[in-house]
């Protein structure tokens, strides 16, 4: 099962978090399937990639309690109910500190959610179509050169 959760970054006592889609059995710092935004609890600044979040929620990803509260504040669930598809590329929730430069809008995804869910299942290591072992990797045709024997000097 895929979870939407926080991945910790930052220095000691100065945490920042990235909101990621990750396999539920993976460790907190594990490799995510996709990064979907970030959250800074010190300044309360949050940036969410709505298209990616909506895609994962449609696929059945389960948000943790903290991510769920961030999604509610941003209005992601209303977008999901209304059926909006990634009309807004990113949402920036105002912070207490100075806002950073805007994030460039990514190109809208043309993939169907079902196809994306299947592709993410393959990436997560779930059963699916698997290539034969011979087709996945070809053997290296270069052979290492043998080392030359050095003459031994008797002392």
Swiss-Prot record:
Source superkingdom:
Bacteria
GO MF annotation list: structural constituent of ribosome
- Pfam families per the record? Ribosomal_S16
Keywords attached to this entry: Ribonucleoprotein, Ribosomal protein
Which Gene3D superfamilies does the UniProt record give? 3.30.1320.10
Compositional bias, Low complexity, is annotated for 124-143
- Could you tell me the Gene Ontology terms of the biological process aspect for this record? translation
The UniProt entry, under InterPro entries, shows: Ribosomal_bS16, Ribosomal_bS16_CS, Ribosomal_bS16_dom_sf
Could you tell me which residues belong to the region Disordered? 100-155
Q: Name one GO cellular component term.
A: cytoplasm
Q: Which HAMAP family match?
A: Ribosomal_bS16
Family note: Belongs to the bacterial ribosomal protein bS16 family.
Q: Which NCBIfam families match?
A: S16 (TIGR00002)
What is the name of the protein in this document? Small ribosomal subunit protein bS16
Instruction: Tell me the name of the encoding gene.
Output: rpsP
């Amino acid at each position: 099962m895929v979870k939407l959760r926080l991945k910790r970054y930052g220095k000691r006592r100065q945490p920042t978090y990235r909101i990621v889609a990750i396999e539920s059995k993976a460790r907190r710092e594990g490799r995510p399937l996709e990064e979907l935004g970030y959250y800074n609890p010190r300044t309360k600044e949050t940036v969410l990639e709505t298209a990616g979040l909506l895609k994962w929620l449609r696929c059945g990803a389960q948000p943790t309690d903290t991510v769920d509260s961030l999604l509610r504040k941003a209005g992601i669930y209303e977008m999901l109910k209304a059926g909006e598809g990634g009309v807004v590329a990113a949402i920036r929730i105002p912070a207490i500190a100075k806002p950073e430069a805007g994030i460039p809008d990514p190109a809208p995804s043309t993939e169907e959610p079902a196809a994306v869910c299947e592709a993410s299942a393959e990436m997560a290591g779930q059963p699916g179509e698997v290539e034969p072992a011979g087709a996945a990797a070809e053997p290296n045709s270069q052979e290492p050169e043998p080392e030359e024997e050095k003459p031994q000097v008797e002392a």
